[in-house]
């Protein structure tokens, strides 16, 4: 479909960017992702198109619904945020995040979460401007750090 092709193309562009790791999506990911996304009800995506350029895909947000045990409610993790270089600075990400928040509220989510690289100052500035903050419970314990372990 047009939307899935846009999603794969935008995600591949993001993966190739230094903020996305600097490597293209694997052939496996490109061919398997459409079916994998369709089978997971806890995932949703928001796409942005520039209709003045013939419905050119210019933005993508992929989200994963999780669960807050403390609140006993769903939460939505904003997993990928992509805006093509030619369209940055036009508040496309902000508009997509407004829609993500509406969808999350519709799902009964208690909060949105996301990770941002410390060197991605433009993204961090946007996120703070629209209400995101570093995660912490007790200020004396500091804020959370995002960690990973490859399997």
Functional labels for PLM-detected ranges:
Residues 79, 84, 117:
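Residue-level recognition of the GNAT/N-acetyltransferase active site
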Residues 66-68, 86, 119-121:
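Short coil/turn motifs at secondary-structure junctions
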Residues 1-3, 84, 120:
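Acidic/polar helix N-cap motif
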Residues 83, 89-102, 125-129:
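Conserved acetyl-CoA-binding loop-helix of GNAT-fold acetyltransferases
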Residues 1-73, 79, 97-99, 103, ...:
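Acetyl-CoA-dependent GNAT
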């Amino acid at each position: 479909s047009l939307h899935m092709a846009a999603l794969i193309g935008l995600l591949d562009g993001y993966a190739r960017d230094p903020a996305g790791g600097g490597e293209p999506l694997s052939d496996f990911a490109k061919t398997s992702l459409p079916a994998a996304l369709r089978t997971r009800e806890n995932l949703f995506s928001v796409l942005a198109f520039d209709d003045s350029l013939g419905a050119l895909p210019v933005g993508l947000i992929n989200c994963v619904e999780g669960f807050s045990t403390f609140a006993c409610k769903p939460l939505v993790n904003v997993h990928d945020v992509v805006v093509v270089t030619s369209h940055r600075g036009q508040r496309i990400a902000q508009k997509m995040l407004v829609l993500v928040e509406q969808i999350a509220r519709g799902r009964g989510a208690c909060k949105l979460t996301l990770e941002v690289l410390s060197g991605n100052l433009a993204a961090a500035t946007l996120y703070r401007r629209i209400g995101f903050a570093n995660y912490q419970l007790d200020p004396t314990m500091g804020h959370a750090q995002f960690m990973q372990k490859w399997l």
